[in-house]
């Protein structure tokens, strides 16, 4: 008996038009804007906005199955051979807010409030609270920059020159993941060597 969840890759490869993918023609546009504003004392506000688009030079070939955007999670699950780009959205499991094949468009908005606990040279430590929202789409017909998956939470970051940035976040996803009906709830995210 075979597992109904098992997919034989050789059958799926035969369904793909190999000539269509002989020469991959695509372009990828990304925008990311981040600002740091000192509020009161040591408290810093960090708003940011991101947008990404994957397009095709030749509409007859369509968008390539590689280099697509996968939204959700901490961004650490991006080690794959298909060139996927994982866009972190705390409060949700990794890659849970995109279709199984990824998406061609994404947008993400963040607002983070940071407070440094210590700024020593050997170890800088700061606490943060955040709100984030984002979504991924297949094309501009389904694109709606106001229909977003939302989350909020708090975290802690430690920067040590020998190890880089380490951190932990606790995020609450207010919306269901794809195929779900209940809010996602709390997720724990570990941060290693990257900056949100």
What is each model feature region?
Residues 1-117, 129-130, 137-139, 193:
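C-terminal outer-membrane beta-barrel translocator/porin domains of Gram-negative envelope proteins
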Residues 158, 184-196:
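Outer-membrane beta-barrel "beta-signal"
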Residues 41-45, 118-121, 158-168:
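Repeated loop/turn-to-beta-strand initiation elements of outer-membrane beta-barrel proteins
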Residues 112-120, 143-144, 157:
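Hydrophobic alpha-helical bundle architecture
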Residues 166, 170-186:
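Outer-membrane beta-barrel translocator/channel fold
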Residues 144-160, 178:
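Strand-loop-strand
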Residues 126-130, 164-171:
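Conserved active-site loop/cleft motifs that coordinate metal ions or position small ligands
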Residues 90, 134-151:
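Outer-membrane beta-barrel transmembrane domain signature
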